[in-house]
Design a protein with these regions (language model features):
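A glycine- and charged-residue-rich anion-binding loop/surface
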Residues: 1-400
Length: 400
């Protein structure tokens, strides 16, 4: 019925079979159904099956097996009983908008740029098509505009069946020589560029119910491009969500929505300036700590805990080990972790890999590296802080 009377979303039917499936549910077959089974890139209908004894039982999925439409339910039904099948109208509308919209968008890129649709996928919140051409931003926008103009013209959509032997004589957008028997054709009037494609999905009788076609993003994919888009109700849902995010961002920046980009550019410039100042301060701090630690070192070895972040800790270690004979083991806290770095100059006596292994064993840390430099971390706890004090109380040479 979804093919012959697509506008009918409810009917009574007789149960032909109802068998358990491996998902702890049941696959229900009836003598007729308004439910569309998943296929041709379109998601399946969902809805309910009703009988007086069980009430409304959800149909969570619908699929075709050996030419038979099966409805996945959570409860069994008796063979021969009469049930009422009802499709979720909101979902059917949304899915049909996406599928008819996909035909129009694919048609637009074919007419304008000779780009062939080589893939179509409908997910819960977006739809994608894959084209065999990579298109520019301007070409993507031109195709979107062309498709929407077809929607606004309320162009007629005609659905008919032909024998596969007649397909070579039809101006189909896509050819498929593997088809046989009776084939369903969906045609959209577009002047000299009539859209015609084989299809098993649900469609409107005209283009207006698609409402709107909006490209959300596009990216190079294989040798062509992948276009993500939404139509009708789904397009409105995307716009509503993104508009809310835009307004929230604008409010946080104290600007109007159309001023968000410039405001973010100013913020980025400010952040870059602050980062430069921070780098300069960190360099000064590293120099001061390096001079202090160098003076406190014994036999060109130092082990110390520093109240700085790990980036600063690494900079200080690098500064110290600019002295070819120097070796350093430095610790610091970052968030809820205790971190360490071991480093040496090219003639330094410390084996940093061996030192990391010993520190890991003492602190329960994870890390490693080379004989020249190593690093690691562990959770900061009272126990690890006590172990750190013990490490720092011993000569750093003991880590070698």
């Amino acid at each position: 019925m979804y093919l012959t009377v697509p506008e009918m979303l409810e009917c009574t039917a007789r149960v032909v079979s109802c068998t358990p499936n491996k998902n702890d549910g049941y696959d229900l077959e009836t003598d007729r159904t308004p439910f569309f089974p998943e296929g041709g890139g379109q998601l399946s209908d969902i809805g309910t099956v009703y009988d007086p004894m069980q009430g409304f039982v959800p149909v969570t999925h619908c699929f075709e097996a050996n030419g038979t439409v099966l409805h996945r339910t959570g409860k069994p039904f008796a063979v021969g009983e009469i049930v009422t099948l009802k499709v979720d109208a909101a979902k059917r509308l949304k899915y049909t908008q996406q599928h008819t919209g996909e035909h129009l968008l694919s048609h637009a890129y074919d007419v304008l740029f000779g780009a062939e649709n080589v893939g179509f996928h409908m997910a819960g919140d977006v739809v994608t098509i894959d084209l065999d051409h990579d298109l520019s931003d301007e070409e993507i926008e031109a195709g979107e505009k062309y498709a929407n103009e077809l929607v606004w013209k309320n162009a007629p959509v005609r659905i008919f069946n032909v024998d596969a032997s007649e397909l070579p004589n039809l101006p189909l957008r896509k050819k498929n020589e593997k088809l046989h028997g009776e084939v369903r054709i969906v045609e959209v009037e577009d002047g000299d560029h009539t859209e015609m494609c084989t299809c098993c999905g649900t469609h409107f009788m005209s283009t207006a119910p698609v409402g709107l076609i909006k490209v959300l993003e596009h990216a190079r994919y294989k040798s062509g491009c992948r276009i993500t888009f939404a139509c009708g109700v789904l397009a409105l849902e995307h716009f509503t969500k993104e508009n809310a995010e835009l307004r929230r961002t604008a409010a946080a920046l104290s600007v109007k929505p159309d001023g968000v980009f410039d405001a973010l550019a100013r913020k980025e410039e400010q952040v870059q300036g602050l980062n430069q100042k921070l780098r300069e301060k960190n360099a000064q701090l590293a120099k001061l700590y390096s001079e202090k630690l160098h003076a406190e070192a014994q036999e060109n070895f130092i082990a110390a805990y520093l109240p700085v972040d790990f980036d600063a800790c690494k900079t200080i270690a690098e500064t110290l080990c600019a002295d070819d004979n120097f070796s350093a083991v430095l610790f610091c806290n970052e968030s809820d972790r205790l971190r360490y770095i071991c480093a040496r100059g090219k003639n330094g006596a410390l084996d940093c890999r061996a030192a990391a292994q010993k520190i890991n064993a003492l602190l329960g840390a994870k890390g490693g590296g080379s004989p020249v430099t190593s690093q690691g971390s562990c959770p900061k706890t009272a126990e690890t802080e006590q172990k750190l004090r013990e490490i720092l109380s011993e000569p750093v040479q003991n880590l070698n």
